[in-house]
Amino acid sequence: MKIGIIGAMEEEVTLLRDKIEKRQTISLGGCEIYTGQLNGTEVALLKSGIGKVAAALGATLLLEHCKPDVIINTGSAGGLAPTLKVGDIVVSDEARYHDADVTAFGYEYGQLPGCPAGFKADDKLIAAAEACIAELNLNAVRGLIVSGDAFINGSVGLAKIRHNFPQAIAVEMEATAIAHVCHNFNVPFVVVRAISDVADQQSHLSFDEFLAVAAKQSSLMVESLVQKLAHG
């Protein structure tokens, strides 16, 4: 099995990249892909850049050039579920855009024409992630993750997301674009991220302070998940 892993920022991939053995680097379209073995399992780790376009471009390049069997999206996220704290884990069962609006033509809010309203994560990947969470004794929430090209740190943006997606557990800037590409390629995906901030008016300060904590927790989870998928 070859496992594709996608993170947006340097801080979100560096811990995993440093553990890849026999590492080779591929630079394509502004993205970097690191291939090799993580604890004996073949992986391709993508640093995509921030935002939906960068994530979709990178995911497409990763799928075309490296042909992974599954995709794990890692990194940080802003917490929406009330129980979440910095360092806690969120696992997607679905991903949706929070900044797409074609409702004038009868689509659901967040749905694009020709696409489902939401992109469902793979049940087996979710189960494997939840098994890892239990083994690592981490706090985690599973549910809807929403994405858009905005860092949410104000009451207006937060209120809009809560109104349109009251069930959402976390918000970030890439996951749904990656899920969209995986849907088109028919490749299973799951989003496994760690909370860096709570999406409020101070979230930009929290993000800067706690990004390293989130990166460490999400990398720990991904490393465990890779082992679980490869060896059961």
Curated annotation (Swiss-Prot):
Translocase in keyword set: no
Its pathway is: Amino-acid biosynthesis; L-methionine biosynthesis via salvage pathway; S-methyl-5-thio-alpha-D-ribose 1-phosphate from S-methyl-5'-thioadenosine (hydrolase route): step 1/2
- List the catalytic residues: E12 (proton acceptor), D197 (proton donor)
The alphabetical list of record keywords is: Amino-acid biosynthesis, Hydrolase, Methionine biosynthesis
Supply the InterPro entries for this chain: MTA_SAH_Nsdase, Nucleoside_phosphorylase_d, Nucleoside_phosphorylase_sf
Q: Amino-acid biosynthesis as a keyword?
A: yes
Membrane-spanning segments: none
Residues engaged in binding substrate = G78, I152, M173, E174
- Which GO BP terms, alphabetically? L-methionine salvage from methylthioadenosine; L-methionine salvage from S-adenosylmethionine; purine deoxyribonucleoside catabolic process
Q: Which reaction does it catalyse?
A: S-adenosyl-L-homocysteine + H2O = S-(5-deoxy-D-ribos-5-yl)-L-homocysteine + adenine; S-methyl-5'-thioadenosine + H2O = 5-(methylsulfanyl)-D-ribose + adenine; 5'-deoxyadenosine + H2O = 5-deoxy-D-ribose + adenine
Checking PANTHER family in the record gives: 5'-METHYLTHIOADENOSINE/S-ADENOSYLHOMOCYSTEINE NUCLEOSIDASE, 5'-METHYLTHIOADENOSINE_S-ADENOSYLHOMOCYSTEINE NUCLEOSIDASE
Give the protein's biological function: Catalyzes the irreversible cleavage of the glycosidic bond in both 5'-methylthioadenosine (MTA) and S-adenosylhomocysteine (SAH/AdoHcy) to adenine and the corresponding thioribose, 5'-methylthioribose and S-ribosylhomocysteine, respectively. Also cleaves 5'-deoxyadenosine, a toxic by-product of radical S-adenosylmethionine (SAM) enzymes, into 5-deoxyribose and adenine. Thus, is required for in vivo function of the radical SAM enzymes biotin synthase and lipoic acid synthase, that are inhibited by 5'-deoxyadenosine accumulation.
Protein name (database record): 5'-methylthioadenosine/S-adenosylhomocysteine nucleosidase
Q: Which gene encodes it?
A: mtnN
